[in-house]
Structures are given as C-alpha cells and as structure tokens.
C-alpha cells in the first residue's frame, strides 16, 4: 500500500542527515578522483551516461539515499502513476505524459478511450498532415508550398517545443531532414508577434495555435494579431492555421482551422513536448520520422526510470542527490550548464519544468511543509556562462550545485584546428576543467585568487546531440523532477501559483481596481 508522507517524518531521512559529509576537495584529488569518475556513472538511453563522481556522495551516502528511496516508495509511486492512478490530486487527474511515447504498464482508459491509442492516433494524424504539407498536397491559396511554421502558445506550449526545435535544427540540416523553418510567438508583448511576423513571408507560413482550454488570454490575443496580419496581406486565415487543443475546447470544431489535433487534461503543459503540442511543430519542421526518433529516446529513458535499484536508475539517483543537496546540505539553487549551443533554451525549459512542478509550500493534502522543496533553476550554455556568472559559482558565498551536459561530437561537423586542437575539443576541455576546478579548487595565498572548491556537479555525457539523445535527456529531467516531488510529498503536476496574477490582470483591464493595484495601473497608462 502506498503512503504519502512528508520528508521530515521518514526515519531514512533522519539517518541520511547523520551520515558524515563528503569532502569533495579530498575525494576528487589525484587517483581517488580518477577512480570515482570511473566508478560513479550510470548508462542512460541513446548512448548517454550520467556521471556523478563530482557530487558530495560516497558509498555511505548512496546507501542512505537507497533507504530513502525505499521508504518513500519512489518506484511504487511511479508504477501507480503510469498505471493510471490519480496522482495529480489538486486537479483530480491522471498523469499520462509518459504514455505519449510508450506504455510502461497496464492499459489506461479514461474518457471512454484507451489513452495510448488516443495519443498514437493523434501522432498519426499529425504525421499524415505534415507529410502532405511537405509533399505539396496541402498548400496556400496560390497552390504554393508552405516554407515556415509558426507556433503560437505560451508556457509549456512554447518553452519545451522551442527548446527541442533549437536543439535539433542544426542536426536536421546536416542530416537532410530539415523541412521548414520554425518560429515561435509566445509573449503578449506586441513586439514579440510583430517581430516574428516581420521576419517571415506570411503567404508561405502555417501557424500552429496551441491552447488546451482554447481560452488562454495571451495565446488568443496573439492569434488575433496573426489573423490581422494575414487579412492585411489579403489571405484567408483559415487556410493558414491549425489548432492543437482539447476535444472539448471551442477551437476543436471551429472552421477557422485547416486541422485540429488533440491533447487532454492528463498532460500538463510543461510535460507536453512529446504530445501533440511538440509533435505538430517538430513534425512539420523536421518530418514525422525525426519526431518518432525523439519519442523513442524518451521511451527508452522512461524504462530505465522503472528500475528499483537506485544505482542503476539515473533519474532516481539524480533526484535523490538533489534532495540531499537541498534538504541536508542546504543548497538553494541549481545551475543547468549544457556545453552545446543547440541546447541554448534547454535551461529555460528546465526552469519551468522544475520550478512550476516543485515550487510548492504545501503537501499533497494542502498542509504547509516545514522543509525546503524545489530549488531555483537557472543556466546558460558553456562556454558562454564561464564569462558570465561562473565567477559567483566559483568564489561566491553560496554553493550552487551544477548539472553539466556535454557531447563528444558537434552536430554540424564543421570545425577548425587552432593551436593543435579543434573548437569541439576546446569545448570539451572546458567542461572537464570546470568540473575539476569546481570540485577541487586551488589554494592561493592571495585570497582574491583562492578557490575553495567543494562545489558539487554532475554531467550527462553523450556522443552527439541526436533526436534520440534529446528525447532521453528530456525524459531524464522530467522523471528526476517527478521523483523529487514524490520525496517532498508535493503535487508536481498542478500550478496554482500562476493563477492569482491572471485574475488581477483581468481586473486591471476591466478597470475594477483600487489601492496599490489602481496606482500601478495608472502609472502604466492602462
């Protein structure tokens, strides 16, 4: 029987708190460090590997984390989730994003349909539509091919799909699978939509409107912006727009769209990149086969997350180490540092994924928790970040755990040899150097040049950023965050924190304000 208990009521957590702290500067130096790098690694899907040698753990800490995983019933809770139990208690919903890429357990029926069948049917509809667009069977009014796809959405309808598109754009061009350029309109700031529309030929563009409810204010505002642009160009908007929405939304059966593809209430926006939300734009941009490869990588990583052996489950171990850093070592934030320019927006996606999921101060039963939960997430690609905020990471007063991602090979393959090494070798040399520099530091009599070390990090290493590798990487972090939510006993699948601002904004626009809200409204000439 599954029990949902607060972290600080678990005896295994109390025992974890008593385990002797690991001194990174000692264990990562010399041959000790070399042995750790070889020992502390777990294979992932798509040729990736999770290496945690530079984390503040040893065999004693790992044993205590294993006991915590067992007492918190992490494997059992994941099993309950993928078998269709109501895990999103706040909204009384199932949590089924894993089912968009595979069925891990029993068949799940909801709304009178088999959900795996529902998701695969939508994928097939999207694939058929994308193939017809690419073949010139679906065209603009002049019979000309569409060359650009523009996604209109916000939050999870933008951050994830945008990050995935940018991650695979160069790979697709190199591997001759690049079909259409993709653009994204998300912010209600009119300059966002205007800038995108000014940069494209609207006559050869197809727009993907993404809104589960069909009532999202920012998205519908931007839809109107786009419709005006199409009308001003003498074009019929209904011949240029498709919708990704729920079957019950007002968009579902509207004549305003060429086609509609469906999602449901069991996949939260931030977990929707492998659903129709990501599927439509990525299939149009790169072809359905590439999207299928992306799903395959995620599916294989999901299977690894089922392993009850913590030391063979990269997602569960990553999650537990993060809990240890947050709740025992007291570190308030985590930096995500991909050494790949293609992953330039991946930290922003993980920021939403993590902070919207686990940025909670009450447990699953609505009771206040008296321990820290989700950390602040930020990041930037390397080596750019080294010339930005790494100063604080190395010598600041706060210790910030680091999550590196690196690949042995570039996507495009074009490179140059300068001073006996290629650019890719320089990139990889920097990430290796940073891991050791953060862990070991460097003593100096000049305190301004002294590096304390003891800054923990992990790295996910792969051969190349491919669709399968990207899918595995995404699933790793989705599952890590899920496991952490289980440990903290919070509901990782709702987001009530985004609601209050929306309510007040509507009051401002209706001129129903008083007090400070009215004064701020007046200052902004609303």
Residue ranges and their predicted role:
Residues 147-155, 207-213, 333-340, 377, ...:
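Short glycine-rich or small-residue beta-strand-to-loop segments that form or flank ligand, phosphate
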Residues 229-414, 453, 500-526:
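Active-site phosphate/pyrophosphate-binding segments
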Residues 1-73, 312, 316-325, 343-346, ...:
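Flexible, glycine-rich loop/tail regions that form catalytic "lids" or insertion modules at the edges
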Residues 4-142, 419-428, 439-440, 462, ...:
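Extended, charge-enriched "interface" segments that sit outside catalytic cores
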Residues 413-449:
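Acidic, Ser/Thr-rich peripheral helices and adjacent loops at domain boundaries
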Residues 449, 464-517:
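C-terminal structured subdomain/cap of oxidoreductase catalytic cores
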Residues 164-169, 198-202, 224-226, 350-358, ...:
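Short, solvent-exposed amphipathic alpha-helical segments in soluble enzyme
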Residues 128-136, 142-308, 507-510:
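Glycine-rich phosphate-binding loops that contact phosphosugars or nucleotide phosphates
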